[in-house]
């Protein structure tokens, strides 16, 4: 018989009745029923009920057991007494009648319980993550994460992709965030950087003659804390392909992502034949470039109905041609209480309020806006929006460049408040035609909008002849249920176009050579057209596990202050370590 176990705690069934077995695991729950001790023994695979009678030689030791002690139990498998089956457990028809117990690892008093799913402060959970990971929901999330990554790998290989590993120690590059720097002992005063993404290496692979690359890649970014991103590091399904156009990438990757979602959606419908939504259209209809298409609300430009109208605030705004009025339909939202609630919410978001019209019985418009613009214009708005009796519409006015984010938040808020969002499906879409550049208000200069290595639509000619802020890129995202879960593009594979693209963003040719010397050199020796994408593993797992917190699907995450409370990182380096690296610290004044 094996030293520790003949079966796992999830393995015993009716067919094992009468067998003498050994189980090892953690004491999940201990109960005393009339002098008989019941110990639910748990391991990675499940739970088995173990029974210790007072006349058993193991009873004295069993009385000393406490939660989360690790023990080995030996005994006979027997049928549970009639009426005591537990249908929620695969082992729920049997129990182990214990003859012998060995304590393998006692446990100190627990700082948080493993049994149950009660909430505990996050810092306690992260400090004692090894206990937290024993809890059923989190344990299952981590197992689901592994299975999702397995599904990604299998599907990528079915599509003809080959897995490569790219370097972790690399050179610093301007990719939008700060790098984590690693000092070189051998080259004093010089630093490696941890990769923000394997962007350059995967493009270099295509220039090295490989055709279809992927990896589950760790990425590192020294960013300020954000609610929608884990501090420090995250993982992505990184992909690159040679001799492809945008449609080729879509054709290869849409079945992979759809298939992964279908594998783990638990029966929820998953979009097939994803819509292609241009970036500008996404902002206009949904107020975001990662729309939640489960929300049926589409915003519309209703400026014409307010131009020259009796509502002077909007009418005066519209005298400036850059300004517009957008309507946010609210099906079933035509009550004064709801409209007032939305108005208060808008003020809480730092806005002056939300104008609204309600449509009463008979289709008559009501509310301050309706009174000011009159029944004819109100009816025209109703016709354009397709609203019905009992509906409402909210209005946002000004420069769309400045209000579209708020309009998108208002659309989401209306959808949530009126229960319009179908929570039981996954709505996926391609967002396409991103702008190549944007104007950086802080630095007062043109900057890259997304990936600096993307091919501009129109190529070098567009870079030479067009206003940079009008140039679109062969760049695309995947949106799902209000999250960006992937981003990619067709790459700029011609050196002269690459230099020009960076020049527009304020980088001289020498700086391009210094920053991207390896890739720049590779472009001189025959670079194939290529493109790819990267899908966020963490966000995909989060969606499929039904949580909104990335820490609930990560093994050992940092807290929001980018501290690893379990391992005590970051920590101070020793004087010896700093001396070897020729580094002296210069701490800011507190």
From Swiss-Prot:
Name the Gene3D superfamilies for this protein: Bira Bifunctional Protein, Domain 2 (3.30.930.10), GAD-like domain (3.30.1360.30), Nucleic acid-binding proteins (2.40.50.140)
Lineage top rank: taxon: Bacteria
**Which keywords does UniProt give here?**
Aminoacyl-tRNA synthetase, ATP-binding, Cytoplasm, Ligase, Nucleotide-binding, Protein biosynthesis
One GO term in the molecular function aspect is: ATP binding
Residues that bind L-aspartate: 175, 221, 450, 491
The residues annotated as site (Important for tRNA non-discrimination) are 33, 83
Q: What class of enzyme is it?
A: ligase
Cellular component terms per the entry's GO annotation: cytoplasm
Enzyme Commission code(s) on record: 6.1.1.23
InterPro entries, alphabetized: Aa-tRNA-synt_II, aa-tRNA-synth_II, aa-tRNA-synth_II/BPL/LPL, Asp-tRNA-ligase_1, Asp-tRNA-ligase_1_N, Asp/Asn-tRNA-synth_IIb, AspRS_core, GAD-like_sf
- Sequence segments annotated as region (Aspartate): 199-202
Single GO BP term: aspartyl-tRNA aminoacylation
* Substrates-to-products reaction catalysed: tRNA(Asx) + L-aspartate + ATP = L-aspartyl-tRNA(Asx) + AMP + diphosphate
Leader sequence range is none
Q: Which Pfam families match?
A: GAD, tRNA-synt_2, tRNA_anti-codon
Q: What residues bind ATP, as annotated?
A: 221-223, 484, 536-539
Indicate where this protein resides in the cell. Cytoplasm
Spell out the subunit comment: Homodimer.
Free-text function comment from the UniProt entry = Aspartyl-tRNA synthetase with relaxed tRNA specificity since it is able to aspartylate not only its cognate tRNA(Asp) but also tRNA(Asn). Reaction proceeds in two steps: L-aspartate is first activated by ATP to form Asp-AMP and then transferred to the acceptor end of tRNA(Asp/Asn).
Q: Which NCBIfam families match?
A: aspS_bact (TIGR00459), PRK00476.1 (NF001750)
Which family, according to UniProt? Belongs to the class-II aminoacyl-tRNA synthetase family. Type 1 subfamily.
Q: Entry's PANTHER family?
A: ASPARTATE--TRNA LIGASE, MITOCHONDRIAL, ASPARTYL/LYSYL-TRNA SYNTHETASE
This one is known as Aspartate--tRNA(Asp/Asn) ligase
The record's gene field reads: aspS
């Amino acid at each position: 018989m094996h030293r520790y176990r003949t079966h796992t705690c999830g393995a015993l069934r009716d067919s094992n009745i009468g067998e003498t077995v050994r189980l090892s695991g953690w004491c999940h729950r201990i109960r005393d029923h009339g002098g008989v001790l019941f110990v639910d023994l748990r391991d990675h695979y499940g739970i088995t009920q173990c029974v210790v009678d007072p006349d058993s030689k193991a009873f004295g030791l069993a009385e000393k057991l406490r939660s989360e002690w690790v023990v080995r139990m030996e005994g006979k498998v027997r049928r549970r007494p009639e009426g005591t089956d537990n249908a929620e457990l695969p082992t729920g028809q049997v129990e182990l009648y214990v003859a012998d117990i060995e304590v393998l690892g006692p446990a100190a008093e627990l700082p948080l319980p493993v049994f149950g799913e009660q909430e505990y402060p996050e810092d306690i959970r992260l400090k004692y993550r090894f206990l937290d990971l024993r809890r059923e929901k989190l344990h299952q999330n981590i197992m689901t994460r592994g299975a999702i990554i397995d599904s990604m790998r299998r599907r990528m290989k079915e599509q003809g992709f080959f897995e490569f590993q790219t370097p972790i120690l690399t050179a610093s590059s301007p990719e939008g965030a700060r790098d984590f720097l690693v000092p070189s002992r051998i080259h004093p005063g010089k630093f490696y950087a941890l990769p923000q993404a394997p962007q350059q290496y995967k493009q270099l692979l295509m220039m090295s003659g490989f055709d279809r690359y992927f990896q589950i890649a760790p990425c590192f970014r020294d960013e300020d804390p954000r609610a929608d991103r884990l501090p420090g590091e995250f993982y992505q399904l990184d992909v690159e392909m040679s001799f492809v156009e945008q449609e080729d990438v879509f054709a290869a990757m849409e079945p992979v992502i759809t298939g992964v979602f279908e594998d783990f959606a638990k029966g929820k419908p998953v979009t097939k034949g994803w819509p292609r939504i241009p970036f500008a259209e996404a902002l206009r209809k949904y107020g975001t470039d990662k729309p939640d298409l489960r929300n049926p609300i589409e915003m519309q430009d209703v400026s014409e109905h307010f131009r020259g109208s009796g509502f002077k605030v909007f009418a005066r705004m519209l005298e400036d041609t850059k300004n517009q009025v957008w309507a946010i339909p609210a099906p079933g939202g035509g009550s004064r209480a709801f409209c007032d609630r939305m108005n208060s919410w808008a003020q809480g978001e730092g806005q002056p309020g939300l104008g609204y019209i309600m449509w009463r019985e008979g289709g008559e418009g009501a509310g301050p806006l309706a009174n000011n613009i009159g029944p004819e214009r109100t009816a025209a708005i109703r016709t354009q929006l397709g609203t019905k009796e009992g509906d409402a519409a909210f209005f946002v006015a000004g420069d769309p460049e400045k209000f579209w984010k708020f309009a998108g938040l208002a659309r989401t808020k209306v959808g949530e408040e009126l229960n319009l969002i179908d929570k039981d499906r996954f709505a996926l879409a391609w967002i396409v035609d991103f702008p190549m550049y944007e104007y950086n208000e802080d630095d007062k200069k043109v900057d890259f909008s997304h990936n600096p290595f993307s091919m501009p639509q129109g190529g070098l000619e567009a870079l030479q002849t067009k206003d940079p802020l009008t140039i679109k890129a062969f760049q695309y995202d995947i949106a799902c249920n209000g999250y960006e879960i992937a981003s990619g593009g067709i790459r700029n594979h011609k050196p002269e176009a690459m230099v020009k693209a960076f020049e527009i963003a304020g980088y001289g040719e020498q700086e391009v050579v210094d920053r991207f010397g390896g890739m720049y050199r590779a472009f001189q020796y025959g670079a194939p057209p290529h493109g790819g994408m990267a899908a966020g593993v963490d966000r995909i797992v989060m969606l499929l596990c039904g949580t909104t917190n990335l820490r609930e699907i990560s093994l050992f995450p940092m807290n929001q202050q980018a501290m690893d409370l379990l391992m005590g990182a970051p920590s101070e380096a020793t004087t010896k370590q700093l001396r070897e690296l020729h580094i002296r610290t210069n701490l800011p004044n507190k």
